[in-house]
Regions:
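SDR active-site strand-loop-helix element
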Residues: 10, 33, 72-76, 109-115, ...
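N-terminal Rossmann-fold cofactor-binding loop
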Residues: 33-39
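Conserved catalytic-core motifs of eukaryotic protein kinase domains, centered on the activation segment
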Residues: 43, 81-88, 120-125, 181
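NAD(P)-dependent short-chain dehydrogenase/reductase
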Residues: 123-125, 154-206, 211-215, 219-220
Length: 222
């Protein structure tokens, strides 16, 4: 794990971002940007040793956020239920470029994408490769999510070249842990009497990764 670094992490209030920030804050100065609009969200960040900073990634309003971060870890994402493609591109793709420009002096950046960028394979047990075809949304809860994350990857690749900023794009699949995750979402839906949304009416196998194991992968990815 990196140590004595100044790390900016987004998506801190999300299911994945919080445990990753907690892991990194053990030996680093970690700043977490979010709107912190929910009651107790700022205090929850401070409790794990993170410096909370209010920012709006979608508009690019960072306030007085420093620019001397050594590493950028970008987990924030917008997943809207409506087919608002303009907002999805602005929040997921354009926001990534603006954030990388703000952290242009960093040593490295980790941009979190998603497994839903892949075009569905006829074999539900297919193990996807990075070179597999992209496209065709597979996130039933958000019709704009997959296409906007493909756009995000394109923006991140362009900014990495333009800024000469070493960047890793990680296509993250299902995760779980005390902070929630896919199994918890399904259980919550069942308990509430709601339908569990699947990628297809056929088999939908997953291989969820625990949030602690995911956090341990951040250092190698950086």
């Amino acid at each position: 794990m990196p140590s004595d670094r100044k790390i900016l992490i987004t998506g801190l209030t999300g299911q994945i971002g919080h445990p990753v920030a907690r892991y990194l804050a053990r030996d680093n100065e970690v700043w977490g940007v979010a709107r912190y609009s929910a009651d107790g969200s700022r205090e929850r960040a401070e409790a794990i040793g993170v410096h909370p900073h209010v920012a709006d990634l979608e508009t690019g309003d960072y306030g007085d956020l420093p620019t001397d971060f050594t590493h950028l870890v970008h987990f924030a994402a917008w997943q809207g239920p409506a087919p608002d493609f303009d907002r999805a591109m602005r929040a997921n793709a354009e926001a990534t470029g603006l954030l990388m420009a703000h952290c242009r002096h960093a040593e490295a950046a980790l941009i979190a994408s998603t497994n839903t960028v892949y075009r569905p394979n006829e074999d539900p047990w297919h193990a996807y490769l990075e070179t597999d075809p992209l496209g065709d949304p597979t996130a039933p809860h958000s019709p704009t999510y997959a296409v906007s994350k493909v756009g995000q990857e394109a923006v991140a690749r362009t900014m990495a070249r333009a800024l000469d900023l070493p960047t890793t794009i990680a296509r993250i699949n299902a995760s779980y842990g005390p902070n929630g995750g896919l199994p918890a979402y399904h259980c919550d839906a069942i308990a509430a009497g709601h339908a569990v949304l699947l990628r297809s009416p056929d088999q939908s196998p997953y291989s969820p990764i625990h949030e602690d194991d995911l956090a341990a992968q951040v250092a190698p990815l950086l």
